[in-house]
Amino acid sequence: MPGVTSQSAGSKYDAIPGPLGLASASLMGKVALVTGAGRGIGREMAMELGRRGAKVIVNYANSAETAEEVVQAIKKSGSDAASIKANVSDVDQIVKMFGEAKQIWGRLDIVCSNSGVVSFGHVKDVTPEEFDRVFAINTRGQFFVAREAYKHLEVGGRLILMGSITGQAKGVPKHAVYSGSKGTIETFVRCMAIDFGDKKITVNAVAPGGIKTDMYRDVCREYIPNGGELDDEGVDEFAAGWSPMHRVGLPIDIARVVCFLASQDGEWINGKVLGIDGAACM
């Protein structure tokens, strides 16, 4: 029977948490905050969370117009949404964002840390300024988003960080700074899963690979030998060949996994980094 409450096996340590038989896709009654949600993967995360019933706070750093488009689309899908401007490279802005987010609906159940920047360059050419730019958002920013998430999430909440398959791959030329900034997230996840345990909050990360966003073709050319010589169709064909499924990943592929981790079904997944690349990096 849907909604049946689980029965304890006799100890508080072996009771199945939550009701049984609920629609696994549902996030009704939850409130989510997604950073960098005005475009790309973050946009689709916010949209899919809304489609599954969550109220969504759309964070953006620059374009209020694109963030408002996401807000309106979520409302059109039948849920509710609001937007907050904050640059996650600035810790003061992160703190302010969480304070404002908590005031909107009085609670916070899910935090998706998505904001990030990409960078390419041979080690010999990397400047301190470029190193700091990338790590300020991809690594330091995610750390302090996580810190504030711990303070503001409800007991039993979910924190989902953004890694990259390049943090797991054997090595990508001219990509040390970006890959390093994402590889660090994997260590954060393992340690934070322990620290967050006293509030029953799970901490996981997704590590996408080859996702077709608005920046996809330009970025893909950097991964492809002589990629600058390929037209758009050639880029698509080459990138599709990375996966035995012979297609590229889409933002919805990431969003669905994020929603699973945010749901009741994902409760016993903790301290893990899930590679989402169609087996491109086996």
UniProtKB/Swiss-Prot annotation:
This is Trihydroxynaphthalene reductase. CDD domains: THN_reductase-like_SDR_c. Keywords: Melanin biosynthesis, NADP, Oxidoreductase. The keyword Oxidoreductase applies. It comes from the Eukaryota. The keyword Lipoprotein does not apply. Disulfide bonds: none annotated. Homotetramer. The active site is at S164 (proton donor), Y178 (proton donor), K182 (lowers pka of active site tyr). Gene3D superfamilies: NAD(P)-binding Rossmann-like Domain. Belongs to the short-chain dehydrogenases/reductases (SDR) family. One of its GO terms (biological process) is melanin biosynthetic process. One of its GO terms (molecular function) is oxidoreductase activity. InterPro entries: NAD(P)-bd_dom_sf, SDR_fam. Catalyzes the NADPH-dependent reduction of 1,3,8-trihydroxynaphthalene (T3HN) into (-)-vermelone. Essential for appressorial penetration of colletotrichum lagenarium.
